[in-house]
Amino acid sequence: MSEHKKPLVLMILDGWGYREDEQSNAILAANTPVLDELWATRPRTLISASGFDVGLPDGQMGNSEVGHVNLGAGRVVYQDFTRITKAINDGEFDSTPALVDNIDKAVSADKAVHIMGLLSPGGVHSHEDHIVASIELAAKRGAKEVYFHGFLDGRDTPPRSAKASIERIEAVFAKLQCGRLASLIGRYYAMDRDNRWNRVEKAYNLLTLAQGDFSYPTGVSALEAAYERDENDEFVAASTITPAGAEPVQINDGDTVIFANFRADRAREITRAFVEPNFDGFAKQKSPALSAFVMMTEYAADIDAPVAFGPTPLVNVLGEWFEKHGKTQLRISETEKYAHVTFFFSGGREDEFNGETRELIPSPQVATYDLQPEMNSEMLTDKLVAAIKSGKYDAIICNYPNGDMVGHSGVFAAAVKACEAVDHCIGRVVAALNKYGGEALITADHGNAEQMANLKTGQAHTAHTSEPVPFIYVGRDATASEGKALSDVAPTMLHLMGMEQPTEMTGKPIMTLK
């Protein structure tokens, strides 16, 4: 007869942050007797789920994708933005092979280096610090002609806020004396993602043919003229920047182009126009034979171009480590968070590991979840209790989506009901563990439901927060450590299961058995 396993259950309460202020706090307003008792009587602490602690920029709120990647990886997983910024700060950026080698190619052939990208401090698709670092690197490598082609933001930044960024770039060139700002166009044209090729064509022709609707001597004068035409940053018409006595800049044969955006979705189309031999989005008037077109990150696996910061495969994430040690695992959630407990928790892997089972509970078909704040949590719990009873699993990873999905609605009363529904379900799970054997860790991936209104404006607060999240151990006697983060959860699970930790996991157990 097969062994009856007593599982360690990781319950991830999505969007369940910790905030002591009762104002607009749906979690504190909710009647949660189960969690209240566990918090009062069990080993517990608070852990960080935002900012540097999860590989995001300092102060940036957490999110579900980043949270689950860190939970499953057992190490801080740096997001592309943070990786590149860190490389600049550490000096490693200046020796990145894809950048150095391809700048050098253009320099040795006496050709130009063109940097293009979203000129913005927004940090969503790009960051102007990365653009400045790229321009400075080209100058350090001896490029005599360095040109920047700016795409203006106004979506991830205020609609008319580009002036300071343009002034910064013009100051960089004034200092370096080896090139200039060459063109400006709104991201509406250069960064389409819906195959609106007529928009992309305008940007491509500006870059390769210096074909603009307007020409100005400076970037600031171009921007001011755009505002006169009532164009916000995002929609600025194609403008060449041509000082008196200078020629408009075109991207020509032998030049190197560096695309400084790090987010892929809106970088792909214009990249394909440059690099794909059989490109058919529009009829190109010019196809420069470049020394290289360098992508800052991998925009798509099928784009054949050098990548400065390639994907970093995560080795020995928790699921893989379980597989290597013959452990069985269940991943279970509703539709809304199913990808998070599978793909993201597995470090970006679609396939199941050996010994892994997946259980998908359909989320309710309602327009918004405030209409059914309990979602399908009872159905999810039925399956979870059955899995505990079955004795088949060494570990179970479960996500209750309610705090986040109802939190996003901004409806306070519904968020309170969502929290109460989850608390009731936790009671059922703990009762099943007491009856059939097993232990639980209860935590969250980021905050949300603990702040449902902006206290200054009174408007609904529908976003995530940067609050810490609870971490409770329902099991043996243990001591909790302070100052931990999501990346310490997988090492905690291994410690409680009596398993060694892979060297790739740099997190440390949050709970130590007494």
Swiss-Prot record:
One of its GO terms (molecular function) is manganese ion binding. InterPro entries: Alkaline_phosphatase_core_sf, BPG-indep_PGM_N, Metalloenzyme, PGAM_B_sf, Pgm_bpd_ind. It comes from Pseudoalteromonas translucida (strain TAC 125). It catalyses: (2R)-2-phosphoglycerate = (2R)-3-phosphoglycerate. Mn(2+) 2 binds at D14, S64, D445, H446. The gene is gpmI. The active site is at S64. Transmembrane segments: none annotated. Its cofactor is Mn(2+). Its EC number is 5.4.2.12. Pfam families: iPGM_N, Metalloenzyme. One of its GO terms (biological process) is glycolytic process. It comes from the Bacteria. Belongs to the BPG-independent phosphoglycerate mutase family. Binds 2 manganese ions per subunit. HAMAP family: GpmI (MF_01038). The keyword Manganese applies. Pathway: Carbohydrate degradation; glycolysis; pyruvate from D-glyceraldehyde 3-phosphate: step 3/5. It is an enzyme of class 5 (isomerase). Substrate binds at H125, R155, D156, R187, R193, R263, A264, D265, R266, K337. Signal peptide: none annotated. Catalyzes the interconversion of 2-phosphoglycerate and 3-phosphoglycerate. Keywords: Glycolysis, Isomerase, Manganese, Metal-binding. Monomer. One of its GO terms (cellular component) is cytosol. This is 2,3-bisphosphoglycerate-independent phosphoglycerate mutase. Mn(2+) 1 binds at D404, H408, H464.
